[in-house]
């Protein structure tokens, strides 16, 4: 019930349409139930008695019932489609908006392939189930109840067969649903793996081709596809028993009614049961059993959708690990940064801390260089500044205020970060750059690109800043992508600029030009540069050396060459490589 309550919030403006669907269905059912009654009267009062006026009367009423049922059926179908499609639209929107609220820690819990599956396949399953619930799950019970009443009014004795058939079907359906649900849960988890394989293959197609690993990728895809096939086979193998069980009950009931009904007509001389009544009873029997069949289909669909609904609610229930305090500050005073005894872990485990007791002061407008090996905690350190994660212990202060006391939107608006993985979106270069500032003028865009050394190569494109960037930026080089991302960050005009190894694909000459532009054009901005090349940070006001989540050394280029063994080793290895 809790899942239903949470999902029902997404109905919203489609609530009235969802209510009107069952209302139309009730009228549709009433007119359909009257049809066998009219047929019985046509046979007994019209055809058997040779009464033409009765035949015309009941024939006309029969046609009117059919037409009325058809009209209400069309209305209910249209309303149902509108309600279910609208519900699915709102559900996807609610999930997507919820994901936008996630912190990095929340996002780390779900793979992108899993989120895509939940937004597409799972929502479609829930949409189909909702459609069946407000239409068939309403229609079938009403039809069943009215048909049972009409059948018992026609012949109580013969209708007793339904009291045997219905429990048999109910027990069988319960067993089928409970056993198949386990496999449906598993199959949707495997769908996540399938999407992951497809996503990795498509985004890494150039790597696959360059290493001639097509066969390996095909085998990997086939393996996951086979797993889905086998799991679905198990689930559908159980569900497949539903139809034979239904048919057995239907044919058994029909045989019983025809045999004993015919005997009653013959033995009683049509005083206990007439031919018309037997005809209507058979029609009611078909209606009752078809309703049971529809209900069984609904139960199977709901069973499948239940697994999807649980996965959707996981997304909706996930609360962001980052929240504003009660009265957050709406201003960042300056670009000074202070780390006070900061420790940090991606998981709540003190033994697996990736940052330990970090103490660091970065004056506003200064340039800090960060050097260190892979996994030393460089990226983790800078991700705490815009509060992408919260510290485990200690505090990070910007402009003298704890980042947890500053409004998240305000904080991130004053910190521009170019991540290790450079991301460009589908659209023109100009549209991508305006992610940094949607109000940026063409002159501001060009100026930012000049600082990032992106303008020279953009001018070589036929459409220049209106050049379309393919998905993932596949039609620009790695270095070009990095420079566009730096330009985008500069358009924010931030108080703090963080480059997380963002010039690794840029040649040393261009790298030097970018650093010179920063020094000359944005002297008041605090600049943090993570790099593998010492040449990228040697002009910084201060350089820190990270090792094992700790600051191993801190000072200028000259100081670290004299005092820090790790820095000296990196410098010597790079200078020897340059000499060779």
Model-derived segments and spans:
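An intracellular "coupling" helix at the cytosolic face of ABC transporter transmembrane type-1 domains
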Residues: 13-16, 101-105, 121-134, 138, ...
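Alpha-helical transmembrane segments of multi-pass membrane proteins
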Residues: 16-18, 65-84, 135-142, 163-190, ...
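ABC-type nucleotide-binding domain
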Residues: 331-580
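Transmembrane helix-loop-helix hairpins at lipid-water interfaces of multipass membrane proteins
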Residues: 3, 12, 18-75, 79, ...
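Hydrophobic alpha-helical transmembrane segments of ABC transporter permease domains
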Residues: 12, 23, 27, 31, ...
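Short intracellular "coupling" helices and adjacent cytoplasmic loop segments at the cytosolic face
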Residues: 49, 85, 93-123, 196-220, ...
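Helix-loop-helix
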Residues: 51-57, 150-164, 234-310, 315-316
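Juxtamembrane helix-loop junctions of ABC transporter transmembrane domains
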Residues: 23-24, 31-44, 65-112, 116, ...
């Amino acid at each position: 019930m809790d899942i239903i309550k949470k999902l029902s919030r997404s109905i919203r403006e489609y609530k009235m349409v969802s209510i009107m669907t069952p209302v139309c269905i009730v009228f549709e059912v009433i007119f359909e139930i009257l049809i066998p009654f009219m047929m019985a009267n046509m046979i007994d009062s019209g055809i058997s008695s040779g009464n033409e006026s009765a035949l015309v009367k009941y024939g006309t009423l029969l046609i009117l019932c059919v037409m009325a049922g058809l009209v209400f059926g069309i209305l209910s179908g249209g309303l149902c489609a509108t309600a279910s499609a609208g519900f699915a639209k709102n559900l996807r929107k609610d999930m997507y908006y919820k994901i936008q609220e996630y912190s990095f820690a929340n996002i780390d819990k779900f793979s992108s392939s899993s989120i895509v599956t939940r937004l597409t396949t799972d929502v479609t399953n829930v949409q189909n189930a909702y459609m069946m619930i407000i239409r068939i799950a309403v229609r079938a019970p009403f039809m069943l109840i009215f048909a049972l009443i009409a059948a018992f009014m026609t012949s109580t004795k013969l209708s007793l067969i339904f009291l045997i058939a219905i429990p048999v079907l109910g027990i069988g359906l319960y067993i089928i649903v409970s056993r198949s649900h386990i496999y449906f849960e598993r199959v949707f988890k495997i769908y996540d793996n399938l999407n992951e394989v497809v996503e990795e293959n498509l985004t890494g197609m150039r790597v696959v081709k360059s290493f001639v690993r097509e066969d390996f990728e095909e085998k990997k895809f086939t393996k996951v596809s086979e797993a889905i096939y086998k799991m679905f086979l198990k689930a559908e193998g159980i569900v497949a028993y539903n139809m034979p069980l239904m048919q057995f009950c239907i044919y058994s009931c029909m045989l019983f009614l025809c045999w004993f009904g015919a005997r009653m007509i013959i033995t009683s001389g049509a005083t206990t049961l007439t031919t018309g009544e037997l005809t209507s009873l058979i029609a009611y029997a078909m209606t009752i059993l078809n309703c049971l069949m529809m209900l069984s289909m609904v139960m199977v669909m709901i069973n499948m959708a239940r697994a999807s609904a649980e996965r959707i609610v996981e997304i909706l229930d996930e609360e962001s690990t980052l929240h504003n305090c009660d009265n957050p500050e709406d201003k960042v005073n300056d670009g000074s940064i202070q780390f006070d005894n900061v420790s940090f872990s991606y998981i709540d485990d003190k033994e697996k801390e990736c940052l330990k007791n970090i103490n660091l002061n970065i004056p506003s407008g200064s340039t800090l260089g960060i050097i260190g090996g892979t996994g030393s905690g460089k990226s983790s350190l800078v991700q705490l500044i815009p509060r992408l994660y919260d510290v485990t212990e200690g505090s990070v202060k910007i402009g003298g205020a704890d980042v947890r006391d500053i409004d998240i939107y305000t904080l991130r608006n004053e910190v521009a970060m170019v991540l290790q993985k450079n991301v460009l979106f589908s659209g023109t270069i100009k549209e991508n750059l305006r992610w940094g500032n949607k109000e940026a003028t063409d002159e501001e865009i060009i100026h930012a690109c000049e600082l990032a050394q992106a303008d020279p190569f953009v001018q070589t494109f036929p459409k220049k800043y209106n050049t379309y960037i393919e998905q993932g930026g596949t039609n620009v080089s790695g270095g070009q992508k990095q420079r566009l991302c730096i330009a985008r960050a500069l358009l924010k005009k931030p108080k703090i600029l963080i480059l997380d190894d963002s010039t690794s694909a840029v040649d040393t000459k261009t790298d030097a030009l970018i650093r010179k532009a920063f020094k000359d054009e944005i002297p008041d901005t605090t600049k943090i540069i993570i790099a593998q090349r010492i040449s990228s940070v040697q002009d910084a006001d201060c350089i820190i050396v990270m090792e094992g989540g700790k600051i191993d050394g801190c000072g200028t280029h000259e100081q670290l060459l004299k005092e820090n063994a790790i820095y000296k080793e990196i410098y010597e290895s790079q200078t020897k490589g340059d000499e060779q």
